[in-house]
């Protein structure tokens, strides 16, 4: 569906660029109608004799040049929905389609339905900055609530007009002859396959949808129920069952206390990796609000709804708290040392009933090397009588249970694999760029990117939550918004300047990797731990800096870091058009620059006292 409103045809259609260009454009843009001399209000906008002595002929379009483009977005989670809001807001004449393989929106929050699934950062920091929700039930809201928030955001901003659900991407191929992406799509409800094309392709799949099963001998020989945390069987009754759980990451930390509380369950938790379990993020704010536990009372939620200033102040404190702990990620800082001591004391207290578990689970590496999670109820569950903490390595899986290296068979009725995802990997479908290079081949040694959002050899392809995109502290949704804003600026440049291919230089990708490697040397992420952030000794998952650093880095694109292919024109200044603007042709808002929303009035008597630029340095 086209992002509305579109401009009148005379404003965006291409006129003749030079005497032999018609054939070129007919071949490159067969579906684009063009006229040689558009008129508006009874006069032609083209000069009667606009050919210069060099043979240059004006491109008969207004300076804004909002030529038609097609954009395909893969994924309807936080990132895809953001594009469904901002592209129609900021761009015109863009035909936008958002494909998602699921039956509903929300991405990972639609797919993950295991018991206890929730965000492990404060809910009010895990939302769009422009669409705050005062009604979160908990400091760590459950998955269904997050999915409902995303669905309501889709409805609020009419994003559903662009979304096609149950549409699975099968392949994406760059066609250099037409400068288009050819995307093969399968409708899952009918098994019909078709091909779509786009000028720009945005991968908004995220990193939490390609399931990673454990590589253990005999996994499929188990005769009982087996499920992955991301492929949960909601119909299975765990009551009175012996449950084996493999994993100690974020999902396992949420699943274990949920299953432990069910009637007559017996849990065998196979945990090899040591990990830090932090106190709840935002604990000081909870104490200030007088919260008993993590649930917001009805009175507190009503206060958020009825008092915008109070709600905004609460949000500000949460965000500031997340951003002020960046020093925790740097080796040797006082904050890092203090955090480790605090975590040790907190974990000892919560594991006091079985102190030996503390010795088994306490890491040798610094807090933050692995992803920190508060894990409400996790440590408390480990000390309960119906939970066995097993550190022995798994040798194999048999039909009746799990055999550890000491030869013991741990009989179970159901096996839960909380083993995460293939993060930082290419999509599970072929993506082919210049000269037939596949992304899997391109990333064979390392997932490479430029500022996390583009990679060389793949023109007009942008990534949300690509390599080196996650954050060690602060707001992930602000990272998503910042990357999305950058991508939309790129689309506008492509549209306005008659660019048909835009690809980051390989040298700039190499420079970004060199910067990233140098930055991470002094961080806790290079400590001795096993983390999805890393591939060997290289950090591939995290942004090399703080969230505020990322927001500023993406604020003003360095256009010189890209290579461009243009429409065949005699002069690359043809983007200047015919000397007219859209406002003049439409006869409206001819002095818009005097309207209050476009005015930037300096402070008197000292312009440098402008408070906005004291908070944040000016940039364009």
Regions found by a protein language model. Give the residues of each.
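Central helical "cap/lid" subdomain
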Residues: 215-226, 400-453
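C-terminal, flexible cofactor-proximal segment of oxidoreductases
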Residues: 22, 279, 308, 449, ...
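Extreme N-terminal leader/targeting segments of oxidoreductases
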Residues: 1-71, 89-93, 114, 194, ...
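Conserved N-terminal/central alpha/beta ligand/cofactor-binding core
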Residues: 124-154, 158, 308-362
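A conserved short coil-to-beta-strand element within the FAD-binding core of flavoproteins
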Residues: 165-180, 387-405
């Amino acid at each position: 569906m086209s992002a509305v409103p579109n401009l009148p045809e005379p404003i965006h259609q291409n006129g003749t660029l030079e005497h032999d260009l018609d054939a070129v454009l007919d071949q490159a843009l067969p579906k684009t109608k063009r006229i040689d001399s558009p008129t508006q209000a009874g006069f032609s906008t083209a000069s009667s004799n606009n050919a210069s002595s060099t043979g240059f002929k004006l491109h008969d379009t207004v300076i804004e040049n909002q030529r038609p483009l097609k954009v395909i977005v893969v994924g309807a989670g936080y990132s895809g929905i953001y594009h469904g809001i901002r592209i129609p807001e900021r761009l015109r004449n863009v035909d936008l389609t958002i494909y998602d393989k699921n039956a509903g929106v929300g991405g990972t929050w639609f797919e993950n339905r295991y018991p206890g699934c929730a965000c492990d950062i404060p809910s009010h920091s895990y939302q769009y900055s422009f669409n705050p929700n005062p009604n979160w039930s908990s400091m760590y809201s459950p998955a269904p609530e997050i999915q409902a928030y995303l669905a309501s955001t889709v409805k609020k901003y009419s994003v559903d007009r662009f979304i096609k659900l149950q549409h699975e991407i099968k392949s994406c191929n760059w066609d250099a002859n037409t400068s288009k992406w050819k995307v093969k799509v399968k409708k899952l409800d009918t098994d019909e396959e078709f091909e779509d094309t786009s000028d720009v392709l945005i991968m908004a799949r995220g990193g939490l949808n390609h399931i990673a099963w454990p590589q253990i001998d005999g996994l499929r020989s188990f005769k009982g129920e087996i499920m992955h945390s991301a492929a949960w069987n909601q119909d299975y009754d765990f009551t009175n069952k012996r449950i084996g759980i493999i994993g100690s990451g974020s999902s396992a930390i949420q699943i274990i206390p949920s299953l432990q509380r069910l009637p007559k369950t017996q849990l065998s938790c196979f945990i090899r990796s040591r990990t830090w379990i932090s106190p709840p993020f935002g604990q000081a704010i909870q104490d200030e609000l007088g919260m008993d536990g993590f649930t917001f009372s009805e009175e507190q939620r009503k206060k958020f709804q009825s008092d915008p200033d109070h709600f905004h102040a609460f949000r500000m404190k949460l965000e500031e708290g997340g951003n002020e702990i960046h020093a925790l990620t740097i080796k040797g800082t006082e904050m890092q040392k203090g955090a480790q001591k605090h975590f040790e004391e907190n974990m000892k207290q919560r594991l006091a009933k079985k102190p030996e578990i503390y010795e088994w689970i306490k890491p040798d590496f610094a807090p933050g090397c692995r992803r920190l999670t508060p894990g409400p109820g996790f440590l408390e569950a480990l000390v309960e009588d119906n939970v066995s903490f097993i550190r022995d390595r798994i040798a194999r899986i048999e039909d009746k249970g799990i055999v550890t290296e000491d030869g013991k068979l741990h009989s179970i009725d159901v096996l839960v694999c909380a083993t995460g995802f293939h993060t930082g990997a290419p999509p599970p479908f072929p993506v082919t760029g210049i000269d037939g290079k596949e992304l899997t081949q391109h990333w064979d040694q390392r997932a490479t990117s430029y500022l996390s959002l583009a990679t060389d050899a793949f023109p007009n392809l942008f990534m949300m939550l690509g390599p080196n995109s996650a954050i060690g502290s602060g707001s992930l949704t602000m990272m998503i918004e910042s990357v999305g804003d950058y991508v939309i600026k790129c689309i506008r440049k492509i549209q306005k300047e008659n660019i048909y291919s835009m690809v980051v230089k390989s040298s700039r990708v190499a420079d970004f990797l060199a910067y990233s490697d140098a930055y991470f040397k002094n961080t806790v992420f290079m400590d001795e731990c096993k983390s999805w952030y890393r591939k060997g000794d290289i950090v591939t998952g995290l942004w090399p800096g703080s969230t505020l650093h990322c927001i500023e880095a993406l604020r003003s694109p360095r256009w010189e870091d890209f290579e461009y292919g243009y429409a065949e024109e005699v002069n690359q200044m043809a983007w200047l058009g015919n000397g007219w603007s859209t406002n003049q042709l439409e006869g409206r808002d001819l002095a818009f620059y005097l309207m209050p929303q476009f005015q930037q009035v300096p402070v008197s008597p000292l312009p440098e006292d402008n408070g906005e630029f004291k908070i944040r340095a000016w940039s364009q």
